[in-house]
């Protein structure tokens, strides 16, 4: 018997989105299918029955999976399986996580996993915002204490019109590609890649998105009611009032003093001293005291948790009431900046960007087209010629930590800095190199992704990449309290990120925005505050760009001597197979002989990448020889390879030779060819005839001075 299903439909951007539950994955707490066109996802939510012991964070796990079968393909690779999550899948997982995480009550420790699986993809209707909608629906059905629902929509502007959930083709045409997520009355998350759009363009898109988000939220509320969902009422079972009183009594003044001294080292030492006194006070309590019991029962360090809450309260009060930040800055002030370029001797381009106690080393490397990244995914894009990698080692924050591959955070930060600089890059026609930039965090105290954006831009310029402009970035924060005007902070440091209500990153040049990422820790941001944050971010960005220009103002005129050189030539398309040879034999021979990298496009454009001019010249000559086709009237320099009584055979290239009849060697009549022409001589000949059998007749005496001049030119 087919199970009973419940569903609802929405109209988003002129397309119908259908959400259905009841048929699949009945062992989950909530499971839905989401479909738009022929793009369909299964989204599942599982909630543990008991809270996890011994953790001080909310254990939410989001996994987004793309199946190659969704586009009718078998995965590449030896095992023909999907393997580990791609960067794209990680970015979508983060996209789902970020607007959901703030909407769970403090102290909730039950494990929640959301799995979004893409099973069908029409390569028109993009799956990421559908996965976000599905995750919210699954949570609403799960009964978990989720303070949603949320809606999510992508917005692009095509021909002056804003479009909700555009197709890939529409988004590619647009200067604006923005994803907005939020509740029925506020924005929680924004993610954007732009081509120098204004702050007003961003606000217009956000306000447009909110109308679509409200529709999604209202539909989900009705959907949950129709499914008879009873939401769990979560009340934090652990009363820490007495512990708060102890901290207030023992440590309040010390914390206050620590935050009013703007030396970071002094503050850390003072806070450690205060925390030690609190712990001693707690340890002196009777063994059967309630505080000892809840710490033993849960494994949670409530002392550290409540101490951090006391820090947060004092730091936020300083900003809200005094207008002073933890390092003494005003809300709109940027930390001191210094930069340098060309710091790595053999790198093609390098830069160090330092802002306060955040320091980034960015290194640019240039390579030929053959080093482009092949994308074996479900999206229409198949390759990348610009890549940015963000590396965050433990030593940057003074910690001992093993060096591993990039985690989700590193992938997200690297992608943001990559998107920030892409609009400033030249086209492949203008600059045919593949470019990779690595940004190593040498020291971290907040805003490392924005430091990577700035460092990358300067490294590209130092490498001689003809970028359109310099790109800078700034991270904004916000402090809120009910009944008070929110304070927007420019260039947040680590503690303001950790204890604040917003992390809002904006990148661009003097005129417009290239990338944007906003995450709220509070339950949303009002539009007027968002508008103010964008305006304040522009002021900060312009200041940062001014500091960067003190070091470098334009791309280097010449590439590094250690960078490869690129040259191009065009061959007839019918000769591509000849140059490649059977099984690639011929092109491998060219690569082995020249040491150059050869890339041949379907149009016949051949790109030769070599570390020296000699290698490039060898490759060019070999390709020219292979594609050589003599024509009547063509003047060629060749070598005499054989002599017979009636003439001399001259090698023309490409495995072809022709014969100079004895009568075509000298102006006067001669009886013997030698000594006029000898084997091994280089001679200039002109093609005078090609017969039906392809035999080539040449002349030496018919070559004029004008012919020789053209050949030498």
Model feature map: region roles:
Residues 106-112, 147-149, 216-234, 287-297, ...:
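Flexible, glycine/charged-enriched surface loops at secondary-structure junctions
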Residues 564-566, 573-713:
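Single-stranded RNA-binding regions, centering on S1/OB-family and related RNA-binding modules
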């Amino acid at each position: 018997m087919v199970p009973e299903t419940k569903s609802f439909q929405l109209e988003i951007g002129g397309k119908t989105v259908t959400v259905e539950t009841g048929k699949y994955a009945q062992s989950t707490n909530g499971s839905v299918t989401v479909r738009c066109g022929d793009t369909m996802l299964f989204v599942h939510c599982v909630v543990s029955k008991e809270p996890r012991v011994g953790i001080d964070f909310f254990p939410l796990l989001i996994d987004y999976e793309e199946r190659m079968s969704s586009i009718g393909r078998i995965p590449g690779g030896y095992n023909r399986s999907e393997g580990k999550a791609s960067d794209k899948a990680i970015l979508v997982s983060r996209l789902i996580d970020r607007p959901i995480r703030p909407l769970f009550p403090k102290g909730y420790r039950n494990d929640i996993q959301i799995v979004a699986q893409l099973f069908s993809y029409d390569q028109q209707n993009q799956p990421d915002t559908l996965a976000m909608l599905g995750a919210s629906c699954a949570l609403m059905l799960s009964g978990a204490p989720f303070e949603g629902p949320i809606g999510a929509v992508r917005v692009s502007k095509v021909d002056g019109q804003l479009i909700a959930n555009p197709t890939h083709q529409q988004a590619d045409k647009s200067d604006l590609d923005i994803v907005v997520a939020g509740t029925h009355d506020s924005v929680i998350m924004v993610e954007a890649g732009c081509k120098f759009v204004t702050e007003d363009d961003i606000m217009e898109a956000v306000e447009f998105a909110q109308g679509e988000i409200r529709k999604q939220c209202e539909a989900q509320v009705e959907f949950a009611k129709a499914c008879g969902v009873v939401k769990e009422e979560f009340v934090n079972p652990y009363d820490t009032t007495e512990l708060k009183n102890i901290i207030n009594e023992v440590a309040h003044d010390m914390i206050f003093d620590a935050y009013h001294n703007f030396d970071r080292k002094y503050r850390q030492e003072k806070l450690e001293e205060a925390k030690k006194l609190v712990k001693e006070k707690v340890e002196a309590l009777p063994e059967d005291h309630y505080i000892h019991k809840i710490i033993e029962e849960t494994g949670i360090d409530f002392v550290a948790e409540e101490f951090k809450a006391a820090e947060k309260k004092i730091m936020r009060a300083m900003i809200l009431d005094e207008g002073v930040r933890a390092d003494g800055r005003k809300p709109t002030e940027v930390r001191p900046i210094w930069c340098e370029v060309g710091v790595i001797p053999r790198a093609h381009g390098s830069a160090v960007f330092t802002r306060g106690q955040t320091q980034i080393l960015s290194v640019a490397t240039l390579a030929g087209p053959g080093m482009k990244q092949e994308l074996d995914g479900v999206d229409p894009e198949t390759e990348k010629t610009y890549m940015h990698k963000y590396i965050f080692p433990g030593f940057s924050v003074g910690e001992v930590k093993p060096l591993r591959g990039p985690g989700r955070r590193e992938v997200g930060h690297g992608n943001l800095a990559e998107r920030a600089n892409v609009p400033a890059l030249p086209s492949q026609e203008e600059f045919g190199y593949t470019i990779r930039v690595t940004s190593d965090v040498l020291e971290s105290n907040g805003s490392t992704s924005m430091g990577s954006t700035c460092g990358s831009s300067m490294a590209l310029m130092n490498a001689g990449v003809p970028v359109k402009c310099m790109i800078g970035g700034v991270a904004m924060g916000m402090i809120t309290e009910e009944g008070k005007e929110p304070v927007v902070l420019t260039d947040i440091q680590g503690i303001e990120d950790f204890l604040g209500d917003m992390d809002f990153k904006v990148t661009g040049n003097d005129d417009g925005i290239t990338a944007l990422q906003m995450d709220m820790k509070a339950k949303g941001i009002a539009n007027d505050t968002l508008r103010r944050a964008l305006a304040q971010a522009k002021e900060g960005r312009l200041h940062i760009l001014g500091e960067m220009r003190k070091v470098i103002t334009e791309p280097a005129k010449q590439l590094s001597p250690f960078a490869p050189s690129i040259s191009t030539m065009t061959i007839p398309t019918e000769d591509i197979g000849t140059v490649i040879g059977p099984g690639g034999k011929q092109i491998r021979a060219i690569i082995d002989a020249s040491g150059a990298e050869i890339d041949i496009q379907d149009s016949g454009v051949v790109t030769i990448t070599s570390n020296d001019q000699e290698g490039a010249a060898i490759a060019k000559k070999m390709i020219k020889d292979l594609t050589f086709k003599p024509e009547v009237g063509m003047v060629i320099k060749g070598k005499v390879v054989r002599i017979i009584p009636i003439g001399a055979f001259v090698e023309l290239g490409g495995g072809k030779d022709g014969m100079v009849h004895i009568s075509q060697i000298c102006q006067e009549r001669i009886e013997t060819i030698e000594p006029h022409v000898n084997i091994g001589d280089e001679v200039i000949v002109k093609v005078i005839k090609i017969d039906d059998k392809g035999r080539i007749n040449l002349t030496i005496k018919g070559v004029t001075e004008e012919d020789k001049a053209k050949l030498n030119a």
